[in-house]
């Protein structure tokens, strides 16, 4: 019995040491968010225990370094003044907020040796996020509208992706939904499929219908639609012939 308890104790000890080592390594390699996730996981439900003190110190360090790095990157990108950086800046602000939200439920975190709480310089990023969301939506909307002018299917598809992202971050922005439908309609490749009977037998109507029922195969997707009957109002982009040689 004592032997089993000793083995269990040693196993738990090595697991704890390994987790601390992984968190330290993540910080040293600059993987601050990984270190934060590891520390938070080990502090959940255990933050007052002595064995979790190293995680509090590492969490404080990783958070400070991660926030500083993100703020420096934002400052650089803003100085560059390139509208293509708006999405990157927006996502960094989201990351800053998400990081704080991950730590907040654990507070306060007391550092025993200092007899004080760990310090986390939390900031309110809501205004910055809302402002960036508006600027980014406007920028992507303008890009999408410009792509419409080219009248090429590939550009309509690119416009659709820009509009789709706007819809994700800023639902129902201007006429985004209407433009998405238009971009999709104009970006589709239509394929006309015909069947040639080479069997020297009469193909049963039901079999022919089943073979040309493309919904069954799941071939149609966002940008490709197959037709077995010609639509006079559609200009087909591709033709496909099915040669039936054996029934």
Walk through the language-model features, giving the residues of each.
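Bacterial Sec signal peptide processing site at the extreme N-terminus
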Residues: 12-34
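Hydrophobic/aromatic side-chain positions at a characteristic register within alpha-helices
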Residues: 27-28, 78-81, 148-151, 168
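Single-residue signature of alpha-solenoid repeat helices
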Residues: 35, 88-89, 159
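Long amphipathic alpha-helical scaffold segments
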Residues: 116-139, 143-194, 199-201, 206-209
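A short, hydrophobic beta-strand-centered structural micro-motif
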Residues: 194, 225-247
